Regions:
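Active-site residues of response regulator receiver
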Residues: 8, 55
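Two-component/phosphorelay signaling modules centered on CheY-like receiver
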Residues: 11-32
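As written
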Residues: 49, 63, 75, 95-100
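Receiver (REC) domain active-site loop signature in two-component systems and cognate sites
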Residues: 58
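Interdomain helical linkers/hinges and coiled-coil/dimerization scaffolds
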Residues: 92-148
């Protein structure tokens, strides 16, 4: 099962995201949730989720700063930025910071989430395969050094 971390300062939104989708149908489970970027950064380090859905506008640390810090720290999972603002500059900033997807909260429903999750599942599968391939190459390289 792939792990999901939900990040939003609004408890109702977090509960909606948790309950709207049958996560297991896509091979995911909600591993945790956070109310701001600082809490999410700590949880992401501990849980190592494959997918993080984060609000953009939050107190203490907003979603864009969270995305920047996660990417700078080497996080290679899928990041989805959520916002209620249909603002091109905000979308652009989120994507430039390292978000893979951007979703408007007022467009979230079961159908849009299912469509997004099918796409995300493919991304997560591909990233896992790439990581596995990288680990195998590193192991082969170490073995090659030992046999010299």
């Amino acid at each position: 099962m792939y792990q999901v971390l939900l990040v939003d300062d609004d408890l109702i939104v977090r509960m909606f995201l948790k309950d709207t989708l049958e996560w297991s149908k896509f091979g995911f489970e909600v591993a945790g949730d956070a109310r701001d970027g600082e809490e999410a950064l700590e949880l992401a380090g501990r849980l190592k989720p494959d997918l993080i859905l984060t609000d953009i506008s939050m107190p203490r640390m907003d979603g864009i700063e969270l995305i920047r810090r996660l990417r700078a720290g080497g996080y290679d999972g899928v990041l989805v930025a959520l916002s209620c603002h249909d603002d091109f500059e905000l979308v652009k900033s989120a994507l430039q910071s390292g978000a893979d997807e951007y979703l408007l909260k007022n467009h979230i429903n079961e159908d849009s989430m299912c469509e997004m999750m099918q796409n995300i599942r493919s991304q997560v599968d591909e990233r896992r395969k790439t990581m596995d391939d990288r680990r195998q190459l590193q192991a082969l390289a170490r073995e090659g050094k030992k046999s010299r």
